[in-house]
């Protein structure tokens, strides 16, 4: 899509857009920065309102999948396919500015005995990110032809179960039984 096609419905000229943005990628970068900043704020608020880190982490990944494959899935598909490095740079910049919410949740889960105490939060975050990236940015799971939610249940959800103590597993089972009903 050209910049002209982007701005025409808004009644803007391309000259106006180029006054503020060097090119289409710069415009997309600024839009992504606003978008992911808003998502980060929502997640921070979501995390603060939760007393159970295991459930909060599960909800986070389920919401992310809904976003990537929901009403705007074509946008995210194209973004993941054509601009993965741009998307990564924006996400990394935003998460460097904000506290590492996921790391804090994992540490809280360890303290509250939801997660096993020998775990390393930094490694857990990396693995979850790799699993999520393999679901959203590769063709690895397309040939299976299952919904993204089912794929998530068989990857990240299973990984989270492996991190849990008996207490954490009880909470997860209660949570899953409540959302399946």
Region annotations inferred by a language model:
Residues 67-88, 103-104, 172, 176:
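Amphipathic alpha-helical segments used for helix-helix packing
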Residues 104-108, 112, 142-181:
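C-terminal peripheral helix-coil segments that are non-catalytic and often amphipathic
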Residues 1-26, 30:
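Helix-turn-helix
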Residues 63-71, 97, 131-138, 161-166:
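Phosphate/oxyanion-binding loops and surfaces in catalytic or ligand/nucleic-acid-binding neighborhoods
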Residues 86-114, 122-137:
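Amphipathic alpha-helical packing segments from all-alpha helical-bundle domains
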Residues 32-40:
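Short, basic, alpha-helical segments at the C-terminal edge of helix-turn-helix-like DNA-binding modules
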Residues 46, 75-79, 135, 139-142:
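Secondary-structure edge/capping motif, primarily at the C-terminal ends of alpha-helices
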Residues 30, 43-71, 125-128, 152:
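Hydrophobic alpha-helical connector segments
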